[in-house]
């Protein structure tokens, strides 16, 4: 059985040791609710990793979007290379939910494009939870949506062991029931192929390796894991478990039982609609439901089978659906990252889903049981919590009111202080800002400017560009990958000034920023609330030279509280540094390109530029060359020659880089 063991050259410093000890003691004392209140740049992820190592519990980390989840997953994989760190987010590249607009009599069919890579990662996560305890699953809020029943998922899995008596046809029938497809030509994830007494199975959660089962009569003679591309054996196994190809896979006897229940519900609902003279709706419902039933009888599933999940699971009306949380053992630990943003999302999920389903049920497109194909209500989510740690620089009242223990992490390992804040009048603010920008650029640093409106942000960007300042503007229409590219361009000096409205989101921890300017700081509202201001001030906490200028003609209550809290933290930090002889140092952070999972999260091709990801480290470069050569061969095999040529060029670039490094060493 694996255990969590951190792989890091660093040890906890500053406030980290006491925060770790405080949370760990709370977990051991069975505290259900705790909060880690950590300032920006205090190493909250490293603290979380140390807590996980000390308590040795399977852990679910929930983030508020796919990209932040991907970044956390990447960090946890670095900390725990020998454990199973998984990624679980919505697998839709594109999703148009089923809906009906009564005013225009428009039915909108469900339309979705599933990202195969993310589907694989989801299967990898659920299967890992059944196989070991040293598992961390980093998920987005989509983890509270209904998923197949874990008991059925486990029951449907097939355990294979050498020396076991297993008839070949029995294995094949089981694979089909688990929704694996037989495909002798295109051997991909979720398929199997057969040649005599040899069965090759490509597990749903696997990336590039498959399982070969060799039979001798009715006995399993050998089990091997092999590389799908080369065919080479990776290792010989004594035992393996194959999990279903779909989280909604259901045994044939369960389907027959479910069909009976669907037919009973259909009869009841038809009587109801007919009694209300809704003849069109009754006819529509009868036709659609009978078609679904026929599909289930013929092939074991139907389009939109998730709408019958309550009946398939044998749940009562209104009973919460099974979710990823149910795949965890009872003693699991949960972290909610950036809880001040994530929890409101969790609370809002159910309401949005319910309002859309009302018209589908009312107008005869779905049976009432479709209501129970839904995300968890917030109180149901709370009931599923075993032990939880909220993580935020600015926790909301919910977290603070519920927490039995609040561990504060104010000291940064780098000794960096919360920035000094200056309030200046709005009169002549743009000229004043221009002067400050010029001085900051001369010192080799970058600037963040936050405005209240899109128009002002655009106008300011154009104005600064006209004055010869390399300025870019970040707005809400930019997708996550483009956003990450802009951040990279700011870090590398392609741009000196970044203007935006809401600069609080993930990924804006830019060490090169030495000035954060907040325009219209005295305008009350969401973007100028105490929490928003503290978060924005935190963007300046990665550089020892950094400071904040608030432009406003009065100090609002929110400004006063944010300034006061920043001063309190700064005082604690200065005292700690003086006591321990620490000189604040700007964070040195390599400029990395978009990580692979982030690209998968956004459904883009995986072969974007990785130049900055390549460090001048021969071991890393050698590893990348091997990975790219493998990708090149795989692409060529699939006749994707453009993609293959891309990887060929990358391999040549890396080999050149390797030679240059070797010359330097000589």
Curated annotation (Swiss-Prot):
Pfam families: Helicase_C, ResIII, UVR, UvrB, UvrB_inter. CDD domains: DEXHc_UvrB, SF2_C_UvrB. The keyword Protein transport does not apply. A motif (Beta-hairpin) lies at residues 91-114. It is found in: Cytoplasm. Keywords: ATP-binding, Cytoplasm, DNA damage, DNA excision, DNA repair, Excision nuclease, Nucleotide-binding, SOS response. Residues 25-412 form the Helicase ATP-binding domain. GO terms for molecular function: ATP binding; ATP hydrolysis activity; DNA binding; excinuclease ABC activity. It comes from the Bacteria. Belongs to the UvrB family. Forms a heterotetramer with UvrA during the search for lesions. Interacts with UvrC in an incision complex. This is UvrABC system protein B. The gene is uvrB.
């Amino acid at each position: 059985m694996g255990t969590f063991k951190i792989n890091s050259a660093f040890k906890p410093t500053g406030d980290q040791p006491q925060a770790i000890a405080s949370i760990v003691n709370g977990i051991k004392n069975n505290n259900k609710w705790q909060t880690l209140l950590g300032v920006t740049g205090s190493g909250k992820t490293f603290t979380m990793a140390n807590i996980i190592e000390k308590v040795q519990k399977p852990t679910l980390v929930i983030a508020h979007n796919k990209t932040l989840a991907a970044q956390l997953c990447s960090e946890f994989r670095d900390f725990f290379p020998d454990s199973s760190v998984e990624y679980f987010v919505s697998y839709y590249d594109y999703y148009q939910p089923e809906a009906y607009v009564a005013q225009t009599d428009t039915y909108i069919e469900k339309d979705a494009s599933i990202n195969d890579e993310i589907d694989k990662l989801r299967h990898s996560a659920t299967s890992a939870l059944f196989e070991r305890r040293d598992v961390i699953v980093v998920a987005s809020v989509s983890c509270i949506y209904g998923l197949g029943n874990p008991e059925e998922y486990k029951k449907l899995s097939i355990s294979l062991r050498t020396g076991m008596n297993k008839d070949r046809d029995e294995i094949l029938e089981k694979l089909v029931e688990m929704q694996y497809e037989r495909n002798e030509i295109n051997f991909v994830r979720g398929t199997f192929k057969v040649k005599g007494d040899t069965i090759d199975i490509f597990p749903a959660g696997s990336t590039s390796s498959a399982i070969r089962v060799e039979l001798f009569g009715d006995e399993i003679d050998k089990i091997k894991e092999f590389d799908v591309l080369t065919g080479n054996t990776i290792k010989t196994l004594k035992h393996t478990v194959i999990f279903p190809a779909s989280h909604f896979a259901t045994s044939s006897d369960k389907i027959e039982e479910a069909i009976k229940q669907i037919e009973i519900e259909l009869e009841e609902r038809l009587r109801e609609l007919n009694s209300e003279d809704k003849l069109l709706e009754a006819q529509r419902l009868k036709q659609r439901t009978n078609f679904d039933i026929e599909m289930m009888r013929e092939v074991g599933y139907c389009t939109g089978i998730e709408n019958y999940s309550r009946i398939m699971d044998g749940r009562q009306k209104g009973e919460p659906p099974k979710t990823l949380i149910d795949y965890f053992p009872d003693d699991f630990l949960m972290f909610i990252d950036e809880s001040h943003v994530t929890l409101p999302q969790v609370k809002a999920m159910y309401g949005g889903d319910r309002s859309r389903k009302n018209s589908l049920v009312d107008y005869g497109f779905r049976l009432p049981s479709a209501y129970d194909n839904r995300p968890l209500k917030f109180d149901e989510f709370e009931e599923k919590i075993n032990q939880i740690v909220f993580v935020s620089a600015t926790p909301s009242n919910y977290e603070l009111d519920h927490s039995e223990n609040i561990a504060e992490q104010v000291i940064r390992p780098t000794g960096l202080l919360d920035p000094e804040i200056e309030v200046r009048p709005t009169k002549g603010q743009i000229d004043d800002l221009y002067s400050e920008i010029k001085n900051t650029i001369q010192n080799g640093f970058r600037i963040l400017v936050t405005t209240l409106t899109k128009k002002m942000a655009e106008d300011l960007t154009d104005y600064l560009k006209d004055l010869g300042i390399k300025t870019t503007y970040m707005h809400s229409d930019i997708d996550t990958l483009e956003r990450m590219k802009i951040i990279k361009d700011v870090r590398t000096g392609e741009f000196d000034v970044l203007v935006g409205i809401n600069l609080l989101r993930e990924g804006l921890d830019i060490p090169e920023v030495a000035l954060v300017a907040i325009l219209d700081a005295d305008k009350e509202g969401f973007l100028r609330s105490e929490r928003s201001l503290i978060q924005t001030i935190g963007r300046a906490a990665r550089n020892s030279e950094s400071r904040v200028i608030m432009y406003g003609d009065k100090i609002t209550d929110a400004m006063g509280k944010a300034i006061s809290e920043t001063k309190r933290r700064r005082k604690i930090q200065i005292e700690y540094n003086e006591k321990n002889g620490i000189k604040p140092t700007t964070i040195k952070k390599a400029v990395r390109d978009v990580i692979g999972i982030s690209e998968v999260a956004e459904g883009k091709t995986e072969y974007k530029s990785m130049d900055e990801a390549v460090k001048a480290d021969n071991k890393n470069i050698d590893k990348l060359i091997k990975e790219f050569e493998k990708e090149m061969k795989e692409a060529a095999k699939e006749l994707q020659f453009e993609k293959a040529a891309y990887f060929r060029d990358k391999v040549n670039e890396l080999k050149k880089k390797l030679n240059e490094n070797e010359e330097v060493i000589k």
